[in-house]
C-alpha cells in the first residue's frame, strides 16, 4: 500500500504517525510536502491513499480536492475538511443531523450582529467562522464590549471577520471534553481543564483521561457522522441539558492524549487508513 503523507511542518503528531506507518511492512510512505508540491490537473502522485496532515486549512482543502480529482482516496476527505474547517457549515451539519449543540446565530453586519447578541443573550462568544487553536475568540460580556469588538473586526479584519458567528456562552466550570473518533469507534477521550474560559491544550489547558461512556461515544459518533465521518476530534461541553458538541476537528492533534488515555491513537489512525476505512 502506497500511502501519501500530505504535510507541512513535521510536528510531534506527524512523527508519531510516521512511526506507526513504519511498523506496517506492507506500507510504503510517499511524503507530499505542501510547501514543495506542484499539482497537475491531469495527473497526481502514484499513491493508493492520502493521509492529510497540513497545518494550513486552505492548503489542506485545495490539496484534498486536487488529489480526489485524480481518484485518490483521502483521509479525511475534501467534503469533511470543508465542513469541519468552517464553524458555520459544522453547525448546519449538526443541526441537520439533530446533534445537540450550543445556540448559534449568524450575522453579516455590525447592526445585525448586535441584534443577534441581544437575542442569544450576554455573555456570548464571538468566533471567526474559520480558525483554530482557540485563536481570535471573544467572550462578549455586554453591549458596550460587543460594539467595540464588532467595530474592530469590521475595520481590521479580513473577509472572514465580516461573517459574525455568535455562540451561546456555556459555563463549563473550567473543563470540557475532547473525544477521538476513528471510523466507527470513539477510541479515547480527555478532559481539558483550565482556569481560562478557553480550554484548549494549545493554550495551556491540562489533559486528563475521560472515560468513554455510552453518552460520550454516542454523541461523538453522531457528530462525526454528521460531518461525513473519518478520523475526527470532537469537542464537547458538559451541561445540565446533557453533552453539547462545540466543534469537530479534521486534522486532529493528539500528542497530549496518548499517555493520558493509554490508547495508541496514531496506531488506530494508521490501522483505519491502511485497512480501507474512509
Each predicted region: which residue ranges?
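Active-site nucleotide/adenylate-binding loops and adjacent lid/helix of ATP-dependent enzymes
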Residues: 1-3, 7, 68-71, 81-165, ...
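A short glycine-rich, hydrophobically flanked beta-strand micro-motif that places a catalytic Asp/Glu
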Residues: 167-168, 229-240
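Hydrophobic beta-strand scaffold residues
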Residues: 28-29, 73-74, 101, 124, ...
Amino acid at each position: 500500500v502506497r500511502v501519501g503523507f500530505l504535510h507541512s511542518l513535521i510536528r510531534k503528531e506527524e512523527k508519531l504517525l510516521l512511526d506507526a506507518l513504519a511498523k506496517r511492512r506492507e506500507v510504503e510512505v510517499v511524503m507530499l510536502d505542501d510547501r514543495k508540491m506542484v499539482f497537475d490537473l491531469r495527473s497526481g502522485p502514484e499513491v493508493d491513499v492520502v493521509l492529510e496532515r497540513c497545518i494550513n486549512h486552505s492548503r489542506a482543502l485545495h490539496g484534498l480536492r486536487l488529489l480526489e480529482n485524480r481518484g485518490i482516496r483521502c483521509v479525511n476527505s475534501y467534503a469533511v475538511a470543508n465542513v469541519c474547517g468552517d464553524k458555520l457549515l459544522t453547525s448546519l451539519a449538526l443541526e441537520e443531523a439533530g446533534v445537540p449543540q450550543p445556540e448559534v446565530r449568524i450575522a453579516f453586519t455590525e447592526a445585525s450582529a448586535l441584534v443577534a447578541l441581544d437575542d442569544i443573550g450576554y455573555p456570548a462568544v464571538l468566533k471567526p467562522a474559520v480558525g483554530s487553536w482557540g485563536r481570535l475568540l471573544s467572550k462578549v460580556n455586554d453591549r458596550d464590549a460587543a460594539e467595540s469588538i464588532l467595530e474592530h473586526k469590521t475595520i481590521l479584519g479580513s473577509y472572514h471577520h465580516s461573517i459574525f458567528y455568535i455562540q451561546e456562552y456555556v459555563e463549563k466550570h473550567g473543563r470540557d471534553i475532547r473525544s477521538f473518533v476513528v471510523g466507527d469507534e470513539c477510541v479515547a477521550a480527555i478532559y481539558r481543564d483550565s482556569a481560562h474560559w478557553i480550554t484548549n491544550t494549545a493554550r495551556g489547558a491540562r489533559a486528563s483521561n475521560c472515560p468513554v461512556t455510552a453518552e460520550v461515544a454516542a454523541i461523538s459518533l453522531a457528530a462525526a457522522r454528521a460531518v461525513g465521518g473519518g478520523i475526527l476530534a470532537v469537542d464537547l461541553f458538559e451541561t445540565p441539558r446533557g453533552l453539547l458538541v462545540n466543534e469537530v476537528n479534521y486534522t486532529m492533534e493528539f500528542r497530549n492524549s496518548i499517555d493520558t488515555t493509554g490508547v495508541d491513537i496514531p496506531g488506530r489512525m494508521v490501522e483505519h487508513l491502511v485497512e480501507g476505512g474512509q
